[in-house]
Curated annotation (Swiss-Prot):
<feature type="transmembrane region" description="Helical">
    <location>
        <begin position="93"/>
        <end position="110"/>
    </location>
</feature>
<keyword id="KW-1003">Cell membrane</keyword>
<feature type="transmembrane region" description="Helical">
    <location>
        <begin position="4"/>
        <end position="24"/>
    </location>
</feature>
<feature type="topological domain" description="Cytoplasmic">
    <location>
        <begin position="197"/>
        <end position="221"/>
    </location>
</feature>
<feature type="topological domain" description="Extracellular">
    <location>
        <begin position="111"/>
        <end position="113"/>
    </location>
</feature>
<dbReference type="GO" id="GO:0000139">
    <property type="term" value="C:Golgi membrane"/>
</dbReference>
<dbReference type="Pfam" id="PF12036">
    <property type="entry name" value="DUF3522"/>
</dbReference>
<feature type="topological domain" description="Extracellular">
    <location>
        <begin position="56"/>
        <end position="64"/>
    </location>
</feature>
<dbReference type="InterPro" id="IPR021910">
    <property type="entry name" value="NGX6/PGAP6/MYMK"/>
</dbReference>
<comment type="function">
    <text>Myoblast-specific protein that mediates myoblast fusion, an essential step for the formation of multi-nucleated muscle fibers. Actively participates in the membrane fusion reaction by mediating the mixing of cell membrane lipids (hemifusion) upstream of MYMX. Acts independently of MYMX. Involved in skeletal muscle regeneration in response to injury by mediating the fusion of satellite cells, a population of muscle stem cells, with injured myofibers. Also involved in skeletal muscle hypertrophy, probably by mediating the fusion of satellite cells with myofibers.</text>
</comment>
<feature type="topological domain" description="Extracellular">
    <location>
        <begin position="1"/>
        <end position="3"/>
    </location>
</feature>
<feature type="transmembrane region" description="Helical">
    <location>
        <begin position="154"/>
        <end position="174"/>
    </location>
</feature>
<feature type="topological domain" description="Cytoplasmic">
    <location>
        <begin position="135"/>
        <end position="153"/>
    </location>
</feature>
<keyword id="KW-0564">Palmitate</keyword>
<feature type="transmembrane region" description="Helical">
    <location>
        <begin position="35"/>
        <end position="55"/>
    </location>
</feature>
<dbReference type="GO" id="GO:0005886">
    <property type="term" value="C:plasma membrane"/>
</dbReference>
<feature type="topological domain" description="Cytoplasmic">
    <location>
        <begin position="25"/>
        <end position="34"/>
    </location>
</feature>
Amino acid sequence: MGTLVAKLLLPTLSSLAFLPTVSIAAKRRFHMEAMVYLFTLFFVALHHACNGPGLSVLCFMRHDILEYFSVYGTALSMWVSLMALADFDEPKRSTFVMFGVLTIAVRIYHDRWGYGVYSGPIGTAILIIAAKWLQKMKEKKGLYPDKSVYTQQIGPGLCFGALALMLRFFFEDWDYTYVHSFYHCALAMSFVLLLPKVNKKAGSPGTPAKLDCSTLCCACV
């Protein structure tokens, strides 16, 4: 019985894999991204907890609301991670981020289960990044960004992201509990890898700005 309960609770516990992602994003001064990851963590964990045994007391929101925002938060996390990788200056950065916030909300309201829920934001972000980087390569007449970015960030990050999506859409029928839990872990790892080492647009260099957990929680609530 204990093993069964632990198995049912595993998707909830595995969603805590986003917690290190929140911490790392904040330390790298990606404060907006950290808040999005925390938002995702909250709704994904609560959604799975409400589906678990003996935890219905935690369900202070309707199931369809939890389901919607867990999917929305995940898709939005993908979008802001890729926009952070693109490294746009203002006002382009905030414009593209808000474009994703609005269009993803409408897309998921229309259909939250299709492949397009995640492939749409990812595909659009990749096209935007490719257009910017190709222009930079043309101006620089060389590779942009540095080779290390491709080998240490983009390659591993996209591999973990692809693994997460394959687990989510093609392998959950094998064993939902374990596969979905690995999906959470792979997705969190993808976000960490795709985020640049430091947010160059966060202000003057020096000691990174502090953002404690209470600020993040208040912003999400």
